[in-house]
């Protein structure tokens, strides 16, 4: 009976460790996805800001040519 308890306790302990390692691995994979989404979002914001600045510059040059006041 004592040997059976020891082996069951050992199996429970090993199963708990295995489950813990799986959860850590899963959370590490999830963090990678979040970082990737943040990078994509950051790239899109940068591209939007560059396009906005180019448009403003072009409009200023066009206004300058039309009015002739530069």
Swiss-Prot record:
Q: Where are the transmembrane segments?
A: none
Judging by the UniProt lineage, the source's domain of life is Eukaryota
Which tissues carry this protein? Expressed by the skin glands.
The cysteines joined by S-S bonds are: 64-70
Q: Which residues form the propeptide?
A: 23-39
- Offer a single GO CC term for the protein: extracellular region
Q: Where in the cell is it found?
A: Secreted
Family annotation (InterPro entries): Antimicrobial_frog_2 (IPR012521), Frog_antimicrobial_propeptide (IPR004275)
User: What are the protein's UniProt keywords?
Assistant: Amphibian defense peptide, Antibiotic, Antimicrobial, Cleavage on pair of basic residues, Disulfide bond, Fungicide, Secreted, Signal
Q: Where is the signal peptide?
A: 1-22
Pfam short name (any one) = Antimicrobial_2
- What does the entry give for GO biological process? defense response to fungus; defense response to Gram-negative bacterium; defense response to Gram-positive bacterium; killing of cells of another organism
Name the family the entry cites: Belongs to the frog skin active peptide (FSAP) family. Brevinin subfamily.
**Role played:** Has antimicrobial activity against Gram-negative bacterium E.coli ATCC 8739 (MIC=100 ug), against Gram positive bacteria S.aureus ATCC 6538 (MIC=25 ug), methicillin-resistant S.aureus ATCC 43300 (MIC=100 ug), B.subtilis ATCC 6633 (MIC=12.5 ug) and against fungus C.albicans ATCC 90028 (MIC=100 ug).
The name this protein goes by in its record: Palustrin-2ISa
Q: Can you name the source organism? A: Odorrana ishikawae
